[in-house]
């Protein structure tokens, strides 16, 4: 039995994204990849950056509700962008997850991002395809 708070990536997240974009008449690209339409690409990029700025403001204010809203919007926009660009999100997710799980926890602040909260690539790490 599935816990009611756990949702399915395909049915819930990707299904919701599909319904949303279809409702407003946004069309998925026929070809896979970043479209030639620079206006669309620039809009989606700016949209993500706007939400990241909102998240930063929420964290600064210690506003949990606004932080959660911004994080969900970031995921929504990122998934929507992948959907519009016809990118193979589920396959990509699995590949990135596999690569991420082969990383190791940083042991000191002297690592790449200067914090022991980070995870780093071991010497034999392989990037996702």
Residue ranges and their predicted role:
Residues 1-129:
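Flexible "arm" and connector segments at domain edges
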